[in-house]
Amino acid sequence: MRLEDYRSYYNVVLPIYHKIIIPQTRGEGWRIMEQLANDFRYNPLTWFVGNAVKTKDYYTHDEVIIYGEPGSGKTSYVIQSMLHVFEDVKEVRRRVIFDVEDLKRLLEDIRDGQRYEVVLFDDPSAVGLSSTWNMRSSAEKRRMLELFDAFVYVKDFISLVIFTVPRLIGVAKFFRDIATWRVQVKKDGKVIFTRREVASTRLGTLKEVDTPVMFYYIKDVRMPNEIWNEMMDKRKRITAEKIARFDSGDV
């Protein structure tokens, strides 16, 4: 993000954030934010992605979990944010993981010396990076565990990892614990960024809390047709494979 973009961002958005945080003016703040809907110059996630893409002489790694009800626009929001930075649908698609084959390709690329600035895991349960291990057979669980173990190491070669899930519990605890940001996308378009911070209780003990810090608003966000069609084809194929396994008794 350029210096002039920073100035514009803070001059326009910070006063709105202030209105949202203070209960007496919260409604007014969201009404103003709605007027900036889909203006990705004021989108915090665009800034995260853009910062990960910047050339650095040191390694960085961060994780963002984006959660919300099915149909709230989580995946479309992330992909449009990435597209605003990369400006190329193919470059965005290469960084999106929909299934095990995508994850395998990612691991092979990293093995061959490539470094990824940003990677989006859409529904981590599809590649075994979720907490729903009880839903898998023993053989499948062992296979997924191998990929999981590999990912724990190769994440150091990815600057920014983004997960999209319906509920926070859908991400394995390992990733929930190290994710700096948790982003809730609501069906009414509100996007709330919370940061994990350490706070002291009255008894003097320390605990982690999620503090709302930044906000955004989306309205009818759509992902590019090429990515949407491929995503739906993959989901249909996986569904067909599951039905075939069930019919054959191999479950």
Predicted segment positions?
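Conserved nucleotide-sensing/catalytic segment adjacent to the nucleotide-binding pocket
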Residues: 95-163
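N-terminal pre-Walker A segment at the start of P-loop NTPase domains
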Residues: 4-55
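A short helix-turn-beta junction within AAA+ P-loop NTPase domains corresponding to the substrate/partner-engaging
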Residues: 173-192
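Short, glycine/acidic-rich hinge or "gate" loops at secondary-structure transitions
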Residues: 93-96, 167-176
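Glycine-rich phosphate-binding P-loop
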Residues: 59-87
